[in-house]
A protein has these predicted regions:
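Soluble non-cytosolic domains of exported or imported proteins
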Residues: 21-25, 174-177
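Histidine-bearing beta->alpha loop at or near hydrolase active sites
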Residues: 17-22, 167-171
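Serine-dependent carboxylesterase/thioesterase catalytic core
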Residues: 2-8, 12-15, 24-122
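C-terminal catalytic-base region of ester-bond hydrolases, centering on the histidine
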Residues: 120-194
Length: 194
């Protein structure tokens, strides 16, 4: 994804964040300096592309620190409506250890504090969902269609500008050539190609 975006003329910042070491609020604070430094060197629109929890992290970040020159946002396999897998596994110690505090915020039933992290979007958001699974165990917990981690229904978001479903599984969304093409189309045109 990053290389193709760069070849298409976009400057990129690929942030490696410690997703298991804090809440979404803490993670938003942690990525803030890198984003602010990157944005300070740009004169044009700043777009965000996030995969899975990265899309939720972008929403939390933008609710708190939205750059003036915000352009468009693309989310790939992001559990905007929560994750049924998180609902089932959140009380299991192995899940808590693997997904950390942010993993506890991924459920479909959100209390008012978690819901407050995700105010309505008022910027252009395009969402790419997958509808294939490579994980038969996770598939048992998810309503169809799904990508093996997130149901297509829970990728949707009130106020989104566009939504597209492609034939791939959750882990491959960021490397799928069609997902990459659709990401660039949305960043450029504000809509996906049909």
């Amino acid at each position: 994804m990053q290389l193709t975006l760069e070849r298409s003329g976009y400057a990129t910042l690929n942030i490696d964040y410690q997703s298991r070491r804090g809440t979404l609020e803490t993670l938003a604070e942690n990525i803030r300096p890198a984003i602010e430094l990157f944005v300070s060197g740009l004169s044009n629109s700043v777009h965000f592309v996030g995969h899975s929890m990265g899309g939720l992290l972008a929403r939390v970040y933008l609710a708190r620190y939205r750059p003036e020159q915000l352009g468009r946002v693309v989310m790939l396999g992001t559990p905007n409506g929560g994750s049924e897998i998180a609902d089932r596994l959140k009380n299991i110690s192995a899940y808590r250890a693997f997904f950390g505090p942010a993993g506890q915020q991924l459920g479909t039933q959100r209390d008012s504090a978690i819901a407050a992290l995700f105010p309505p979007v008022d910027y252009p958001v395009g969402i790419i969902a997958g509808d294939r699974s490579i994980d038969p165990i996770a598939s048992a917990f998810l309503p169809k269609p799904h990508d093996g981690r997130v149901s297509v229904a829970n990728t949707r978001l009130d106020g989104m500008a566009d939504h597209v479903v492609i034939a791939t599984a959750h882990p491959w969304l960021m490397r799928n050539s069609l997902a990459i093409e659709q990401t660039i189309a949305f960043l450029r045109d504000g809509r996906f190609r049909r």
